[in-house]
Structures are given as structure tokens and as C-alpha cells.
């Protein structure tokens, strides 16, 4: 009953509004004429329809139908052609083509009429061309900056070595040698650290290496440096015995000593003034990092305390801030053997493996979702691909890039990336499941549209 009353009231209001419209239109014809009255009538009906939509309840289906109708009207509305620029108005207008209904006549050619110039087609670059442009703009470092960075790193190494010899005269350190990607042609942008090796000179015959899997840590990445010959050379015979923990040379104790020295004892303002730059030790990182600011570049120097060549395999072990039971162990540094292997493979067939590695490093640094993929992960991927006997010329760089993305996605699906030189080490073991999902999704999206990564 209420609905009926509502419809009846609505009908009465419609009739009243309709009579008012008729009255207005009738009088408008006298004043405005027929054309003006028509315009006024259309405007009045539009207002009436707007009022009806706002006041009357409507069914959901009717609303959706009207919405789709309005959308179709918008799509069907012809777009206005833009007005030609003033310069084009002075150009001669080309004659119109004869219509099909016009009688055919002899074809006349006007040699003075110039053909209309079409706009240039949009530039579509291939993946190969985009990779080369990305390499030129985001990867390549100017030679002047490389030379300046090497000079600063070498000067800092000399100053730091002089300080260590005066501060710890009883500890035999070897020559401080700067190195790393900057020196091996593997620097992708300015994000990589300069590696400053601080080697310990251990007495031959008093130390031996124990694999990490044979220790309580059960970590295949690490090694323990054990003190031997205690019956002939008792504890205290070696200056490094002060860093022993349970009969093993502790990397953690040595790192704590050197971190305190770098943060509190070194006169960095004086050294920086001498070298023409600003040097500050990084207090936020557990690693021994020096932040260098020059007017022409910024540089980070990683001070790496190392134990070189204790065994016949000439392994390089680093004092690294490890957690848990592995805190006193030494991390095996694979960078030297990785860089040497990539160089040997490229020299054999004039390949582009190292260029592919630089591209991958720059892409991952430029994408926040891929930030967890470090140089170590990407180097292993390139090494696995690099051992295959495929085309490694510059023309195949785009194909190898996509192949590297596919290999990364496959490894993430299995949550396993074995080390090329030690398959028992899974380089994805430190990633959480959420991080693996995020990286996998970003790589899958990049595989569908590789240009989006560049």
C-alpha cells in the first residue's frame, strides 16, 4: 500500500512538473521563438530527469544498465580533432580525393603540391638494445672516477697499515692490499665496496684448518683455525694466542679489538685532510666499513681481516660477523676464485659473462624487491650458465639475460642455489620464505616484461 501511495504521489508530482513545463514552453514560444523554446525545453527536461534520479528509488539492475549505457555513450562520442598549429595554417591545402559518385576524369598531377608528412613512428627498441643502453647509462663507470677511487683506496691502505704497526707492534700483519670488483673490472656502479685485505701472518706448523661441518656449528661455509703443537710451542709462543677461544683462533675477538681501534683510536680527520676527503668509520654495520666522501665521488672501504694460505689449497678465510655457534669461525671467501673463473671463461671464448653479471647486479640494486639478491647469488648464476657451451657473444647478451632470470626463478622455486665451488652450501639458506616469494614474483614479472627491469 505504501509503495502504491509513493508511486501515486510521484505520478502527481510528475504531472504537476509536466504542466509547469508545458506552461513555460508555451510562453517561451511567444518570447524566444520556436528555436529558443526548443533549447529551453531540452534544458528543462534534463533538469527534470536529474531531479527524478536524485529523488526516486531505483533498482540496482536499472542503475547498472544506465551506467553501462552512459559508458557506451562515452565510448561512442567522437573525439574532436585538435586545432592545427598556426604554422600549419600557412601551408597549402592538399586537394580532396575525388568521391566515388563523381564522374571520372583525366588524372591531373600537380608537381608543386608536396605530399603530407606523416609523424615519425614511435621508437621500439629490442631487449638487446635496451640492455646495451642500460649498461652504458647505469653500469659503466668513467675511467677518471675509477682511477680516483683506486688512488684513495691505496692511500687509505698505507695510512691504516702504518697505524696498525704503531698501535699493535706485537701483531704481525702482512701488507694491506686493496682489491675487489673495482680492480677486477666487475664494479657495477658505485655501490660495491673496495676490499681492503688485512692479512694475518701465522706461524707455519702452529695452525691448521678444520672444516666447519666438523665443528659444533655444522656450517659448511666456515672453517676453524686450530692451534697445534702446544706440547712443543706452548700457549703464549705465538702473538695470536691472545685471541684463542677453546684452542681456536677466534674471529669475533679479533674483530672487536679492531672495531674499537678504528672507531676510537684512529685520527680520521687528520688522515682525511691529508688525502683531501672525509673518512668516517661506519658504526651502524657489524662489518669494518669506512665511508669516504670526496668532492667527486663517494666510496666505501671494507676492512677484511683475513687468514691466507694456511693449507695447501690456499684458501682465503675472513673474520666475518657470524651468528650463533659459528661466531668464532672464519668464513671462506669465494670472491677471488669466482672472479678468476669468470675471467678465464671469458678469455677462452671472448665472452660476455662478466658483462652479464654487471647487468644483473645493477638491475637488482635498482629494484627494491630484488635487493636481497647480492653479488654472491648472481655470480653463482652466471657461473652455472657460463660453463655451458653456448653463444656468449654480445649479440646473445639479451638471450643470456633471460636465461639467467629463468635460472633464478627455478632456484627460488626450490629454495636452493648450490655454490659452484662447494655444492653443500645453499646460498638461499639465509632468505626467509616471504623474501623468496617477493623475489620470485618480481623476477617472474620481469621475465614477462624484461624492459620493466631496465
UniProtKB/Swiss-Prot annotation:
Stretches of the chain found on the membrane's Mitochondrial intermembrane side: 1-22
Compositionally biased tracts (Low complexity): 88-103
Membrane-spanning ranges: 23-43
InterPro entries: Mab-21_HhH/H2TH-like (IPR046906), MAB21L/cGLR (IPR024810), MID49/MID51 (IPR045909), MID51-like_C (IPR049097)
Record-level GO cellular component terms: mitochondrial outer membrane; mitochondrion
Disease in which the protein is involved: Combined oxidative phosphorylation deficiency 49: An autosomal recessive, mitochondrial myopathy characterized by progressive muscle weakness, intermittent muscle pain, exercise intolerance, elevated serum creatine kinase, and deficiencies of multiple respiratory chain enzymes.
Protein name: Mitochondrial dynamics protein MID49
Amino acid at each position: 500500500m505504501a509503495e502504491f501511495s509513493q508511486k501515486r504521489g510521484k505520478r502527481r508530482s510528475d504531472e504537476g512538473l509536466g504542466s509547469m513545463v508545458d506552461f513555460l514552453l508555451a510562453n517561451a514560444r511567444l518570447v524566444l521563438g520556436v528555436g529558443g523554446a526548443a533549447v529551453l525545453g531540452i534544458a528543462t527536461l534534463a533538469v527534470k530527469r536529474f531531479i527524478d534520479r536524485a529523488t526516486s528509488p531505483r533498482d540496482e539492475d536499472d542503475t547498472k544498465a544506465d551506467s553501462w549505457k552512459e559508458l557506451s555513450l562515452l565510448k561512442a562520442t567522437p573525439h574532436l580533432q585538435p586545432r592545427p598549429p598556426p604554422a600549419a595554417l600557412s601551408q597549402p591545402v592538399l586537394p580532396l580525393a575525388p568521391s566515388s559518385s563523381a564522374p571520372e576524369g583525366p588524372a591531373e598531377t600537380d608537381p608543386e603540391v608536396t605530399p603530407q608528412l606523416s609523424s615519425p613512428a614511435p621508437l621500439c627498441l629490442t631487449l638487446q638494445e635496451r640492455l646495451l643502453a642500460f649498461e652504458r647509462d647505469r653500469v659503466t663507470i668513467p675511467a677518471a672516477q675509477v682511477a680516483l677511487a683506486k688512488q684513495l683506496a691505496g692511500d687509505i691502505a698505507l695510512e691504516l697499515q702504518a697505524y696498525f704497526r704503531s698501535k699493535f707492534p706485537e701483531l704481525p700483519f702482512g701488507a694491506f692490499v686493496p682489491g675487489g670488483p673495482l680492480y677486477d673490472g666487475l664494479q657495477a656502479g658505485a655501490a660495491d665496496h673496495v676490499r681492503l685485505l688485512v692479512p694475518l701472518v701465522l706461524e707455519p706448523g702452529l695452525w691448521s684448518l678444520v672444516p666447519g661441518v666438523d665443528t659444533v656449528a655444522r656450517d659448511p661455509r666456515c672453517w676453524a683455525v686450530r692451534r697445534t703443537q702446544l706440547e712443543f710451542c706452548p700457549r703464549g709462543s705465538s702473538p695470536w694466542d691472545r685471541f684463542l677461544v677453546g684452542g681456536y683462533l677466534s674471529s669475533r675477538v679479533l674483530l672487536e679489538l679492531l672495531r674499537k681501534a678504528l672507531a676510537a683510536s684512529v685520527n680520521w680527520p687528520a688522515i682525511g685532510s691529508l688525502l683531501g676527503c672525509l673518512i668516517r668509520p661506519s658504526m651502524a654495520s657489524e662489518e669494518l666499513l669506512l665511508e669516504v666522501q670526496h668532492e667527486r665521488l663517494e666510496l666505501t672501504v671494507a676492512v677484511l681481516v683475513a687468514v691466507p694460505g694456511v693449507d695447501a689449497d690456499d684458501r682465503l678465510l675472513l673474520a666475518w660477523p657470524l651468528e650463533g655457534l659459528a661466531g668464532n669461525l672464519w668464513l671462506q671467501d669465494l670472491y677471488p676464485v669466482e672472479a678468476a673463473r669468470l675471467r678465464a671463461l671469458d678469455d677462452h671464448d671472448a665472452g660476455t659473462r662478466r658483462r652479464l653479471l654487471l647487468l644483473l647486479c645493477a638491475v637488482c640494486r635498482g629494484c627494491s624487491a630484488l635487493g636481497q639478491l647480492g653479488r654472491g647469488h648472481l655470480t653463482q648464476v652466471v657461473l652455472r650458465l657460463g660453463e655451458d657451451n653456448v653463444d656468449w657473444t654480445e649479440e646473445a647478451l639479451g638471450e643470456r639475460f633471460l636465461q639467467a632470470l629463468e635460472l633464478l626463478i627455478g632456484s627460488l622455486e626450490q629454495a636452493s642455489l648450490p655454490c659452484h665451488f662447494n655444492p653443500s652450501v645453499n646460498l638461499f639458506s639465509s632468505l626467509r620464505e616471504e623474501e623468496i616469494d617477493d623475489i620470485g614474483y618480481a623476477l617472474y614479472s620481469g621475465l614477462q616484461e624484461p624492459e620493466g627491469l631496465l
